[in-house]
């Protein structure tokens, strides 16, 4: 049987949500420069779309991390496969992620980056699944919240 996929949001709706988040970022960072940290690979297009709508000065860097290695199941150990090229000491950093569910990997990334003394460290995500959290991660900006459906007994 062929699976039917239903569109939840149109391209135009998503574009409008990106504009709304960019407007909030512009207000929150007025008079400051943002250093966007794009978590590879999933967030590349979201990060690019967001950066185009931000009017305050922006620089961008990339980080790739995995807790899976060559396994199908997470090992729980964070492996940085591509670290930042730039020093973030004293900079206002915005981590841009595509999907946040358990929060495990992102929590470890935040701890690693916080130890590098940024002036501020915030998180923006395209898709947030707070019901799936295994660790506490404060998401500052999210486009879409997905709640797990309640299962019937």
Residues covered by each model-derived region:
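Single conserved hydrophobic/aromatic residue that forms the stacking wall/gate
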Residues: 144-153
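Active-site-facing substrate-recognition patch
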Residues: 1-33
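Internal catalytic-core helix/loop-beta-alpha segment
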Residues: 87-126
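Short, glycine/charge-rich flexible loops or terminal/linker lids adjacent to PRPP-binding catalytic cores
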Residues: 18, 57-93, 104-107, 133-136
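Short secondary-structure boundary/capping segments
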Residues: 6, 26-28, 52, 70, ...
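ATP-dependent adenylation/pyrophosphate-handling site
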Residues: 61-65, 119-132
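Conserved PRPP/pyrophosphate-binding segment of the phosphoribosyltransferase/PRPP-pathway fold
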Residues: 26-70
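Generic structural signal for small/hydrophobic residues in well-ordered secondary structure
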Residues: 14, 36, 64, 95-98
